């Protein structure tokens, strides 16, 4: 069987359970298949995950963010291979990971959630250095996720600086 011809659903090969699970997780439980602004909806998916991780305490929450990023790298890389397109818009687990990094170590107040969401979306779109370089030059799961992690780091710093001046 040739891997060059798309099969059912446009995937590059027939999918086993692990493949289907990877695509399902990478697309944010199929949220990424929403035709308008899938990245925005994928970012929203990160909010309930943040609340779940907050229940683990500070150290557990940070460990949970790291574990989620590693999971995102794994499933995004596998999904990208199956879909056959670099950083396909339907892959949104990276947006959720970026929001988790944005809010890591911060109280989950309505202000932080709204400002963090907005800051992350802006940083994800602008892709400040080195995010754009990572997005262009890295391949596989790390290439899909790492630019969003960088955007999340910038957004986290922005929120911390903003809160030190405002509150």
Give each language-model segment a name.
Residues 159-167:
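Juxtamembrane boundary at the C-terminal end of a transmembrane helix
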Residues 47, 105-106, 140, 163:
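Aromatic-rich, lipid-facing transmembrane alpha helices and their immediate juxtamembrane interface loops
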Residues 53-60, 105-112:
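Transmembrane helix interruption/hinge and helix-loop junction motifs
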Residues 51, 66-74, 98-99, 103-104, ...:
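Alpha-helical transmembrane segments of multi-pass membrane proteins
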Residues 51, 55, 81, 103-104, ...:
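Transmembrane helix-loop junction
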Residues 42-53:
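Membrane-embedded alpha-helical segments in integral membrane proteins
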Residues 56-73, 90-93, 115, 123, ...:
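Alpha-helical transmembrane segments and their juxtamembrane interface "caps"
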Residues 2-44, 74-102, 122-153:
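Interhelical loop and helix-boundary elements at the membrane-water interface
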């Amino acid at each position: 069987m040739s891997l060059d011809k798309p099969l059912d659903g446009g995937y590059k090969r027939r999918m086993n359970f692990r493949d289907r699970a990877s695509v399902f997780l990478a697309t944010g439980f199929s949220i990424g298949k929403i035709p308008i602004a899938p990245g925005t909806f994928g970012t929203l998916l990160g909010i309930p995950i943040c609340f779940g991780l907050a229940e683990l305490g500070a150290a557990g929450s940070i460990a949970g963010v790291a574990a989620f990023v590693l999971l995102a790298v794994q499933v995004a890389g596998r999904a990208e291979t199956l879909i056959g397109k670099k950083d396909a818009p339907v892959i949104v687990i990276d947006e959720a990971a970026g929001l988790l990094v944005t809010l890591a170590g911060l109280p989950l107040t309505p202000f932080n959630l709204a400002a963090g969401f907005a800051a992350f979306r802006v940083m994800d779109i602008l892709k400040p250095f080195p995010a754009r370089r990572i997005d262009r030059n890295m391949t596989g799961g790390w290439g899909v996720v790492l630019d969003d992690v960088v955007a999340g780091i910038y957004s986290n710093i922005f929120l911390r600086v903003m809160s030190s001046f405002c509150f």
